[in-house]
Amino acid sequence: MPSTALTPFVLSKPAILIGAAPTDLAGIELCAPEWPVFAADGGLHTALACNLQPRAVIGDMDSVGALDQLDPAIELIHQKGQEDTDFEKCLNLIHAPLVVGFGFLGARHDHVLAVLHTLASLSDSRPIILVGQDDVMMRVRGDCQFHLPIDIRFSLWPLGQQSFTQSEGLAWPVDGMTMQIGKQTGTSNRVIDTTVKLQAGPGDGYMVILPSACLPQLLQAALYLANLH
């Protein structure tokens, strides 16, 4: 029976969150086996199809179908309402130092925009990674550093307004730049050094977008930001 309890899951390790967008979970093997798995509503089907048992399913339960055959060990948290998305409902209840999301990119564009809106509205500073078939992206607040192959694409997307004071390792430096949607963004840059550093000024945070093959490097950077290195 679904619960409406809103007691958060307080975790000391990263969490894996699976959404309902099509995904083969490529890259999930890079996550440690002890990281707990959560499902956002219909993401339950993807998790079970890949032999992953979520600790909990969170959402408005409009996409999960019949629940009576589920393992009773899976907690069902039913949150009604259309004023927030299942992704937002999950992030509000999963208090982990890092969240790695699969199944939130690559399907409907309006859903992807809703995901970015949620990341822009978060008040905390934890890194959040989203894994897609072609891209991986990470929400960042503050400075960050990456160890990357030379000549790959490197994009920055502001979550509101974000300034940068200094950068290293990019073909087109973002030193002194203030990014804002509709005015200035930082897509389609290129890595020219194996170490890329970004020193951020005041702002609302930003997304770092890389090719999907760079998930290992993105995870490494995220674990450092989450003080889990």
Q: What feature does the model see in each segment?
A:
Residues 8, 31-33, 42-126, 131-133:
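Acidic/Gly/His-enriched mid-domain segments of enzyme catalytic cores or analogous surface patches
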Residues 24-28, 46, 216-217:
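Short N-terminal binding/cap micro-motifs at the start of the first secondary-structure element
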